[in-house]
Amino acid sequence: PGGRPKYHAKKYKHQTDLLENDDIDAVIIATPDHWHSKIVVDAVKAGKHVYCEKGLTRTFQEALDIHDAVKETGMILQLGHQNRQVEANDKAKEIIDQGLLGPVNLVELTTNRNSQWGAWVWNIHKDANSKTIDWETFQEPSPNKIPFGSEALKRYFRWRCWYDYGTGLSGDLFSHDYDQLNQIMEMGIPKYASASGGIYFYKDGRDVPDVWHVTLEYPDRDMTVLYSATLSSNNSRGNRIMGHDATMILGGQSNAGGVGGFSVE
């Protein structure tokens, strides 16, 4: 953290101090999701270009705030979907653009994980306490505040399990697979969307689902996109683009095994 010692990288406790440094041209934001909007807006207004990890924001209003700030300042914003650099996605796009699959009417995207790590149940550091964690700053942008204590420690280290700080399966994992599809097929925004799910395995106080199912309808493309996820099974299913003449099976972006290639059947 803070860079290799020999380069004497300066450390900052708060982002406002860092943004006041005129020697900094761009920033990388890899905080929990609930801080993204404020830091992005502050950064572009301070004249810094921004690379921000997904999910970009927790709420639609936060996304609008970022849009307006970036447009107003003219700074560059890049969203951190790092799998855009996967060569297999470019090859898959070439195959589809050549029409080798024929008309595509159904796409299935999936996430399967089956470990505490994959379900964001991460260890609470033995030295974590009110002196080593600035809890009030951490929870500052969250809609619901709680006092520091055992519950706060759990939320600090496992923040992805609560919508106060993260975006759950939607922004954390589905966003990878949808971005992969968008890169390959340029889907854009669906006309209709519905989702359902629940907390069926990890009864640990979280409020984000551990099972989730999404249907996206693209009537102008004659296509339905399905996404299903579970955090209690490691049956890796991959992602399927099903055409009239052939089906393309892609390695899932957000499964525990990492990014794979693809096959055409």
Question: Which residues does each predicted region cover?
Answer:
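N-terminal Rossmann-like dinucleotide-binding module
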Residues: 1-6, 83-86, 96, 181
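Rossmann-fold dehydrogenase core element
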Residues: 64-82, 92, 100-107
